[in-house]
């Protein structure tokens, strides 16, 4: 039990320290999504595990509204699409959670050339979401805020010809 005021871990480490296949898969995800370390991946896996656990609990209950609220919440943050239901939560993968990170959305929207550059733009305060500056690459972008991504007005990156911009002409 953690003492009040002390941080607790928000993730679980793998049970076995060396499994070659798992390590190769984690390394691939780290490079594909521009994650800093495996802790970020383990956090996403723990978040997904919590979603699945909640879905299993809600599937066991009958006649509750909380299942619909849970699905609506996952649809708001973009992990589930509009037509998916509570059963579909069990088939989610860690990539579904990683795709909703601000760092990934900035890259997918074409504001950065690479995932690493997207991470740098976010952590250096060049990106705003819904008009407010967000400096956490792990921020989960709701679907409603996805089209409000932009460079900060005070950033040099607002210039279309800035050399660091994606697709900048030289």
Curated annotation (Swiss-Prot):
Keywords: Ribonucleoprotein, Ribosomal protein, RNA-binding, rRNA-binding. GO terms for biological process: ribosomal small subunit biogenesis; translation. The keyword Metal-binding does not apply. SMART domains: Ribosomal_S4 (SM01390), S4 (SM00363). The keyword RNA-binding applies. Residues 100-164 form the S4 RNA-binding domain. Belongs to the universal ribosomal protein uS4 family. Part of the 30S ribosomal subunit. Contacts protein S5. The interaction surface between S4 and S5 is involved in control of translational fidelity. One of the primary rRNA binding proteins, it binds directly to 16S rRNA where it nucleates assembly of the body of the 30S subunit. With S5 and S12 plays an important role in translational accuracy. This is Small ribosomal subunit protein uS4. It comes from Halobacterium salinarum (strain ATCC 700922 / JCM 11081 / NRC-1) (Halobacterium halobium). The gene is rps4.
């Amino acid at each position: 039990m953690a003492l009040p005021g002390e941080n607790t871990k928000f993730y679980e480490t793998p049970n076995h320290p060396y499994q070659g296949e798992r390590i190769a898969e984690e390394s691939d995800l780290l490079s594909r999504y521009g994650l800093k370390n495996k802790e970020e991946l383990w956090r996403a896996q723990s978040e997904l595990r919590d979603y699945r656990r909640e879905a299993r609990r809600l599937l066991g209950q009958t006649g509750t509204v909380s299942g619909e609220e849970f699905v609506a919440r996952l649809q708001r943050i973009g992990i589930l699409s509009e037509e998916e239901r509570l059963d579909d939560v069990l088939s989610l993968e860690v990539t579904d959670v990683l795709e909703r990170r601000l760092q990934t959305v900035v890259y997918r929207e074409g504001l950065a050339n690479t995932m690493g550059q997207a991470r740098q733009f976010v952590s250096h305060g060049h990106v705003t979401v819904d008009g407010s500056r967000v400096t956490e690459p792990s921020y989960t972008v709701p679907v409603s805020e996805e089209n409000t991504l932009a460079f900060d007005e005070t950033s040099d990156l607002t210039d279309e010809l800035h050399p660091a911009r994606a697709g900048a002409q030289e």
